């Protein structure tokens, strides 16, 4: 069988995963050097589609990354105004006084958010900086150079049958390489 010909894309930086960490990395790198070409691969059909969790969000990292996030129509707008910590037994619950709680369990001043909405917003912010985001493309294989250094990823082949044989609509995955 002949070697499959694959399209190759080259970037300065390739990031796998458009979650909070991947998108924040892309944003920070683009802020540091606007000339960098940055690609983010996301396996879901759209950014945020595989992040189903809610979150109590402390904004310190976001304050450093995007200092004016409050003026940018971010999805972070429901602040924690009260909180209770309960201890449960088999038959009842008891409220634990807040002064017994360590500071890491206190969330007053933090925000209640949807991580999915945060990722969508960060994705739009990153794209506005010039980051290229490819939703619907899962990285399926690492690419190595002759010294066994990772130089990129290959996206999954599309149009395969249940036995992983090419169908009429077969499209080979793309090799996406980065300098970093």
Short names for language-model regions:
Residues 5-7, 174-175:
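Short, flexible hinge/linker loops that cap or flank conserved catalytic cores
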Residues 43-92:
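N-terminal FAD cofactor-binding segment of flavoenzymes
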Residues 76-79, 84-180:
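Feature captures the FAD/FMN-dependent oxidoreductase FAD-binding
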Residues 1-2:
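N-terminal mitochondrial targeting presequence
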Residues 38-44, 178-180:
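Extended hydrophobic secondary-structure segments that form protein cores and membrane-embedded regions
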Residues 22-30, 62-66, 153-162:
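Short, well-ordered amphipathic alpha-helices
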Residues 11-39:
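N-terminal Rossmann-like FAD-binding beta1-loop-alpha1 element of flavoenzymes
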């Amino acid at each position: 069988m002949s070697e499959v010909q694959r399209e190759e894309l080259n970037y300065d930086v390739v990031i796998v995963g458009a979650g909070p960490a991947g998108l924040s990395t892309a944003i920070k790198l683009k802020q540091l050097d606007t000339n960098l070409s940055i690609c983010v691969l996301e396996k879901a059909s759209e950014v945020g589609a595989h992040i189903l969790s809610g979150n109590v969000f402390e904004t310190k990292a976001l304050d450093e990354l995007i200092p004016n996030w409050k003026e940018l129509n971010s999805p972070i707008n429901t602040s924690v105004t009260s909180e209770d910590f309960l201890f449960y037994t088999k038959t009842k619950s008891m409220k634990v006084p807040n002064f017994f709680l360590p500071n890491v369990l206190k969330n007053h001043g933090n925000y209640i958010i949807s991580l999915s909405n945060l990722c969508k917003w960060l994705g739009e912010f990153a794209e506005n900086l010039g980051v290229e985001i490819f939703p619907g493309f899962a990285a399926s294989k690492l690419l190595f150079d002759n010294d066994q250094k990772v130089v990129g990823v290959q996206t999954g082949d599309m149009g395969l049958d249940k036995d992983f044989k090419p169908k009429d609509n077969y499209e080979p995955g793309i090799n996406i390489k980065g300098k970093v």
